[in-house]
Amino acid sequence: MNQPILSYAIQQRRYQAAVPFISRTVLDIGCGQANLPDFVPPLEMYVGLDVHVGCLQLAQKRYPQHQFYQLDLDRQFFPSELLDQRFQTITMMAILEHLAYPLHSVWQAAELLAPSGYLIVTTPTSLSHRVHQIGAYLGLFYREAVDEHKTVLDRDSLSWLFIAVGLEVVVYKKFQFGCNQLIVGKRRN
């Protein structure tokens, strides 16, 4: 599949925004082809979840030492194999806007955080919605991604999601000229 010119650059910037909070054990929700390990030092444990089987097959070829699971976040619970594990870092990079029930997935993620672990979320801002539509039309972004957006979350709604599942918001910031936002929550001990 040909990748639109700006999609990879934007993905790189998302990862760079998250790197300061990434620890040695990572659950990457919406991992795609598992590009996150390219941006961080070697990890003790990396587990990727994604809905797209083709992406997971490529990820498994690139990283045979890591675990990958197919999962539709709107229709399924996390794999039972993960329920006894705890992760220092859980990422949801550009995922929540694709979900009909983001609270369900944030709650499941929070349950798998280790004490003092971080949940890192990036999502487009309302400004980026229109920019994304124009960019997709021009072939700069994936057209499918725009069509799949089910919700637009702002700072208040993201903060509410984190607080509702018992996380303390430690960082919120916009980046990429206000088109994306990063929120980091820490599990309360």
Where are these regions (language model features)?
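Conserved N-terminal segment of class I S-adenosyl-L-methionine
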Residues: 1-85, 89, 103-106, 146, ...
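A short beta-strand submotif of the Rossmann-like class I SAM-dependent methyltransferase core
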Residues: 89-95
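Conserved class I S-adenosyl-L-methionine
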Residues: 120-141
